[in-house]
Amino acid sequence: MLSFVKKSIALVAALQAVTALATPISSEAGVEKRGSGFANAVYFTNWGIYGRNFQPADLPASEITHVLYSFMNVRADGTIFSGDTYADYEKHYAGDSWNDVGTNAYGCVKQLYLLKKQNRNMKVMLSIGGWTWSTNFPAAASSAATRKTFAQSAVGFMKDWGFDGIDIDWEYPADATQAQNMVLLLQAVRSELDSYAAQYAKGHHFLLSIAAPAGPDNYNKLKFAELGKVLDYINLMAYDYAGSWSNYTGHDANIYANPQNPNATPYNTDDAVQAYINGGVPANKIVLGMPIYGRSFQQTEGIGKPYNGIGSGSWENGIWDYKALPKAGATVKCDDTAKGCYSYDPSTKELISFDTPAMISTKVSWLKGKGLGGTMFWEASASKKGSDSLISTSHQGLGSQDSTQNYLDYPNSKYDNIKKGMN
């Protein structure tokens, strides 16, 4: 139980967090305004429409502030391109005509635009890169010419598709030169966004974010203060702390280290967040990323113990969709020191680390106390519905979410139906 002093400290921290989030974000680097409420963002993957059968209409749009549509690929010369044109803008959904006049967007692009019209507080951002498609970022960011190409290409897709901003998922800058080039790349994109807005969108503030590492080997290379100036959001990938690469079973997304069981907590979120803040990132630009999946370990006696293999998964070995958890016969346990949960089945000796709704509530309370900017989830197709939904739990816990409206007017989109607002 908290003492009176600790309660007072907690109250002060909460008031500071509310005060910080009540003020629009500003900086000298072009970020003039961003929503004052909390973000509740979620990644939507275009490959999810296939085997997972998760379509844009399945998103809990009324609970989400930002959809991060992933992923676009990038060439070494800086050009952005679609890795799946069918999913992005060719697939015809129910109600889509094959006889429309002109050049029109279909697929996820049209479906997301329609969702934007129905849910004016839900913004959609174009996410570029990802783990698989980060190979060409170093080259694309290496010169002023390639950075300009990247910025123009990215903003071109944004306006053609009727999106609200750009999210860059570069995993990861490998050294100081790449880290500085990342800043220059982001500055080029920010400049291009503002230039487009001035000419075609009445100065509207389009958003710019990144997916950011939570491991010190990667985040210690970043230019924290400069990132804090140019970005609206830094979406911290505070997960994948343990997995097939680990020597012991461990928590996937724990807040703290556990000194009594260090093997279970090789990384932790609190250290990462503090590093970003100490480096000069405003706390309310940091968004806490959380997994909608679990990582499994086989033939183990428990958390922080040796294991043998990771087993199968929902779509790839060792990774289970949250909606498949906990498995029958497994008991959910939580480490109250580390703030991490897992399921364990003593008969099969399988351990799966994942976040429960109660842990999401704990994390939301924690991030509010830190004055952070909200939550992000990877990724939408793995979620449950109803009271067990992690996205819904976050939505309810955050309370005052970002209510800035999305943008619908794209007069120079190359797609006639987006140009006309789907009217």
From Swiss-Prot:
Cited InterPro entries: Chitinase_II/V-like_cat (IPR011583), Chitinase_insertion_sf (IPR029070), Glyco_hydro18_cat (IPR001223), Glyco_hydro_18_chit_AS (IPR001579), Glycoside_hydrolase_SF (IPR017853), Glycosyl_Hydrlase_18 (IPR050314)
Limits of the GH18 domain: 38-401
Assigned keywords, A-Z: Carbohydrate metabolism, Chitin degradation, Cleavage on pair of basic residues, Glycosidase, Hydrolase, Polysaccharide degradation, Secreted, Signal, Zymogen
Catalytic activity: Random endo-hydrolysis of N-acetyl-beta-D-glucosaminide (1->4)-beta-linkages in chitin and chitodextrins
Maturation propeptide residues: 23-34
Documented EC number(s): 3.2.1.14
SUPFAM superfamilies found in the cross-reference section: (Trans)glycosidases (SSF51445), Chitinase insertion domain (SSF54556)
Main location per the UniProt record: secreted
GO CC entries: extracellular region
Claim: Hydrolase is one of the keywords in the record: yes
GO biological process, one term: chitin catabolic process
A GO molecular-function annotation: chitin binding
Subcellular location as annotated: Secreted
Family, similarity comment: Belongs to the glycosyl hydrolase 18 family. Chitinase class V subfamily.
Protein's UniProt name: Chitinase 1
Gene this protein is translated from: CHI1
